[in-house]
UniProtKB/Swiss-Prot annotation:
It comes from Neisseria gonorrhoeae (strain ATCC 700825 / FA 1090). The gene is xseA. CDD domains: ExoVII_LU_OBF. The keyword Hydrolase applies. Keywords: Cytoplasm, Exonuclease, Hydrolase, Nuclease. This is Exodeoxyribonuclease 7 large subunit.
Amino acid sequence: MSDFFHSDVLSVSELNAFAKSILENHLAGLWIAGEVSNLTRAASGHYYFSLKDSRAQVRCAMFKGAAARLAQPLKEGDHIEVAGKISIYEARGEFQITVNEVRLKGLGQLYEAYERLKAQLQAEGAFAAERKKPLPVRPQCIGIVTSLAAAALRDVVTTLKRRAPEIPVIVYPAAVQGAGSGFQIAQAIKTASQRAECDVLIVCRGGGSIEDLRAFNEEPVVRAIEACTIPVVSGVGHETDFTLADFVADVRAPTPTGAAELVSPNRQESLHRLVQAQGRLKTVLEQRYFDASQKLDWLARQIRHPRQKLDEQRASIGKLAQTLSYSMTQNLRAHTARFERQTQALQHCRPDVSVYRQDIVRLQTALPAAFSRLLARRRQSLTAQAALLEAVSPQHILERGFSVVKNTRGQVIRNADVLKQGQKLHITFSDGETDVRVSKEQGQQDLFDCI
């Protein structure tokens, strides 16, 4: 561990990398069995699913290249065996299997070979319906390919003797299980085809496991049936058993006994089927006659005279006219009632003009007297304010014997101390004005010299 990491304390990424290395280096080449669940197929063609058993599950990813090699698409609930790289997705620390190979659980390579050959034959058209040969209605001779010791042979012969004892039977013996059985079956079919002694050939054996039925899934047997010039009926195993021989045969029977019944006519059954067919035909004809009669009656009821249709239209127009008249009358009444209500409301809202007229006359009479009184008060106030203004006016003060002395700059002289000898002054009296000059050589009463 010290060679892989630089510290005894691992980071999460180091732990995941270490676990991934252990899994990939020590768990290679394993096959894991389980049930498919949570299956998702992405648009890219990849599969993502879980493989589970009764106690645990593991996430699996199967990429497009491996998925293309599947014999058939995976389905939810499939019991399979997978092989691939067992690893950890480091980013999330999730244990997963990157699947490279898949096979059905319990079948392994045998089932894979079956599916590969089936896909190949299907691609070649070996199972196509158009290459199937019809069975003869009444064969002159029936051939059987099976083991002489097989119970299936006894079942087939017993059925043929019961149903068509007059038809001869030829058996082409071959082992139907074990080593070399596929080759023997193929040779027996080829022999029957070459001799052309029979009109139809039954290839059959009893039921068994897929291993027991292995010979009927081998390519030599399938190719021999495909190349056979005689119509071949397969009766291999039970109804639930399907082999490649069943797919390539001209007709597949669920059992060996069923194959014998298919190729042998039964006079009593044929007569019975004929009677049944006659009964069914009669029933069908009677039902068709009854249906046609009902349809004819219905069509007859649908056909009406033009006058009847015109009367219906006239009645409809009359009804519409009545409805329109009634609607207009109701509308007019509603508007009239509304107009009357609004007229009454307007009358209640109209003011009493006579009352307002009396108020106007009274106000017109009182207005001149009020205006005269207001004017007298305004004149009296104006006279008082004029007298007050006159009393404090400069002109009135001058008339009382005062004068105003100003220097050459127009400033009023209020104190004699600011005067200088020879200073020019301007004096304003109530009735005129004059210019003087200051002279200190005289007494105060002669302070100024007239200029």
